[in-house]
Amino acid sequence: MIIYLHGFDSNSPGNHEKVLQLQFIDPDVRLVSYSTRHPKHDMQHLLKEVDKMLQLNVDERPLICGVGLGGYWAERIGFLCDIRQVVFNPNLFPYENMEGKIDRPEEYADIATKCVTNFREKNRDRCLVILSRHDEALDSQRSAQALHPFYEIVWDEEQTHKFKNISPYLQRIKAFKTLG
């Protein structure tokens, strides 16, 4: 089972495309939708939905995957639910760059301070990070600096922030998923 979390643009047709691409790894891909506008409610909702899926799950090696803001959530929810994560261009600093787009961006900073201390150290090697060198929305170098001490970073030379084509990475993701 692969759980897919969309980014800020929840209505993007790219979400459906990514789900279809992920089905080459595992036919059981589940899109979990969330508001993107209310961080504390989103976190509660995502934890509840992912936990429900895991309770009914028969896959011994589930995976959670997210793009952009979905990557922010996939890393955290995956850690809290003890499943591996794959994140594409994760928005690691939404409290800085979501100003004016969501109701309370400061809630992201609050979530970060309330999350498990040093969670990335405890999550070491359980997240695969794929970053685009041409991310027009986020500073991918800054993301790499924050994540490289803990996770493997794979660099993409072609995709933009929304990462429309993940197919070149499907074999890598599949291998990462099988590590369980």
UniProtKB/Swiss-Prot annotation:
Q: Which Pfam families match?
A: UPF0227
Q: Which family does it belong to?
A: Belongs to the UPF0227 family.
**Protein name according to UniProt:** UPF0227 protein YcfP
Native source organism of the sequence: Salmonella paratyphi A (strain AKU_12601)
Protein's gene:
ycfP
